[in-house]
């Protein structure tokens, strides 16, 4: 068997195991994703660059360079990289804008705040497309919020408002790679479900 067929078989088994366990929501195991950002490398105006370690772990991601001001393909980037066998009760995990901006570069947006907001707009288009196709829960992966000692929660909140305002799906902010005990109050005030 080749790698693609093995990956597909494992994906189907993972999805089947979740269904058989009667989980409330089922997710794609993302076995075809090299990292949580990689599908976005296919956007126009985005160039994959060097490999980098994520937060001093032995996990790597490809740094993306956003070379223009408009980076979207109409909201099909994430959806086209997910397995089509997901049931109706499906969920998806994607990076939130602050983490995205922390780990990537932009030639157009020199201020990180502007980059975060524009990434939020791009992600909202992606999320709207996912919700239209039946995704009920959107998990926003936020390791930078946990890892960084200082976080501009005003910018994080503004970006999350772009993503969540009027959204017809639940949103979960998933923090990891750090202790958030000193940030709890700020986290509880963020506009997520």
Regions found by a protein language model. Name each.
Residues 1-193:
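Domain-level signal for soluble alpha/beta catalytic cores
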């Amino acid at each position: 068997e080749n790698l693609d067929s093995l990956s597909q078989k494992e994906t189907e088994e993972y999805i089947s195991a979740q269904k058989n366990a009667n989980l409330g929501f089922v997710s794609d195991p993302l076995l075809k994703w090299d990292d949580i950002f990689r599908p976005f490398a296919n956007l126009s105006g985005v160039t994959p660059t060097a490999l980098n370690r994520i937060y001093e772990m032995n996990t790597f991601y490809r740094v993306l360079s956003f070379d223009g001001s408009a980076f979207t393909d109409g909201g099909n980037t994430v959806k086209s990289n997910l397995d089509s066998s997901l049931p109706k009760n499906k969920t998806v995990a994607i990076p939130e804008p602050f983490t995205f901006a922390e780990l990537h570069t932009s030639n157009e947006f020199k201020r990180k705040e502007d980059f975060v907001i524009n990434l939020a707009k791009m992600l909202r288009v992606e999320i709207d497309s996912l919700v239209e196709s039946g995704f009920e829960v959107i998990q926003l992966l936020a390791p930078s919020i946990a890892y960084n000692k200082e976080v501009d929660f005003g910018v994080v909140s503004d970006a999350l408002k772009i993503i969540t305002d009027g959204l017809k799906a639940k949103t979960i902010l998933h923090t990891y790679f750090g202790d958030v005990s000193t940030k709890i109050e700020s986290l509880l005030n963020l506009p997520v479900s």
